[in-house]
Amino acid sequence: FVENVDRSKIITAGSIMITRPAVARLRKEGPEVLIRKMKERDITVLPVIDENDKLIGEITLESAAILRRKGIKSIQEAVQSEVHSVTEDTKIEDLLPLITKTNSPIYVVNEERELKGLVPLSSIVVEMTGKDKEEINELIQNAIEL
């Protein structure tokens, strides 16, 4: 019964998202704190939220390092506001077109744009292919290096 079901039409962003991900708080944290957060978690990008937990963009490890080198304490100028976001009920089949346009996670927000979680690209591929996460991460890394 279950073997012929198209998982992409059933599984939602909300069911595979990482809840309570590490974030960058726009007016509260500077580059130094964000660099430490990213290195501790072995990640290269953080969602940026405002004081109301609304998603306003993302910042990369590289951008934070440049700010630190320049001695700039605010992350404002390094925030990339064009990010992909979806709601929790978005089906994986609707996330697929987004993964070809970004190396960043897909952010999950509510109607008020409050950050609810994020979906790593590897999680989408794992759900679609049934391959394990290590195998997928290796494939993604090889593709990025091309």
Label each region the model flagged.
Residues L61, R69-I72, Q80, L121:
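ATP/adenylate-binding site constellation spanning eukaryotic-like Ser/Thr protein kinases
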Residues F1-V5:
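Short, low-complexity N-terminal regulatory "tails/caps" that precede and couple sensory modules
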Residues D6-R7, I59:
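Intrinsically disordered, low-complexity Ser/Thr- and Pro-rich stretches
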Residues V23-I43, I49-N52, R68, H84-E112, ...:
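The conserved cystathionine-beta-synthase
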